[in-house]
Amino acid sequence: MTIKRFFVCAGIMGCLSLNPAMAEWTGDARDGMFSGVVITQFHTGQIDNKPYFCIEGKQSAGSSISACSMKNSSVWGASFSTLYNQALYFYTTGQPVRIYYKPGVWTYPPFVKALTSNALVGLSTCTTSTECFGPDRKKNS
């Protein structure tokens, strides 16, 4: 390998390692988490020729959260089928879960007004209202 090729390859590798487009992970954010939630509502539909589903969940204290997933939309769209199957299972069984969501993703006004702007980004099982498996999204103090 010539010196020129070496520096070209090293430069390319250096640029790739500095790329800010890192993997999106459910545990990255510091907000958007409700624990000990029972999914009480389930809705499916289609928008812009893409299927979507939405859930609403309630905590025992009465707080509620809604979130939606849309196939092949947003960075979380690739998880649509997995999230759909898990959400439907948890809705059917009534098992308490932790709902991870990203606020403000959906922006179409009629959709947001009727459902939510929150994107569903993950689900975890819970053994109590506060003890759940998976990342714990705590806001920075």
Swiss-Prot record:
Its main location: secreted. Keywords: Host cytoplasm, Host endoplasmic reticulum, Plasmid, Secreted, Signal, Virulence. It is found in: Secreted; Host cytoplasm, Host cytosol; Host endoplasmic reticulum lumen. One of its GO terms (molecular function) is sialic acid binding. Changing Q59A: Reduced toxicity of SubAB5 for Vero cells by 87%. Changing K102E: In strain: O29. The E.coli strain this operon was isolated from causes hemolytic uremic syndrome (HUS) and also encodes a Shigella-type toxin Stx. Receptor-binding subunit of subtilase cytotoxin SubAB5. Required for receptor-binding and thus correct trafficking in the host cell. Has specificity for host glycans terminating in the sialic acid N-glycolyl-alpha-neuraminic acid (Neu5Gc); each subunit in the SubB pentamer binds one Neu5Gc. The protease subunit (SubA) cleaves host BiP/HSPA5, inducing the host endoplasmic reticulum stress response and eventual cell death. This is Subtilase cytotoxin subunit B.
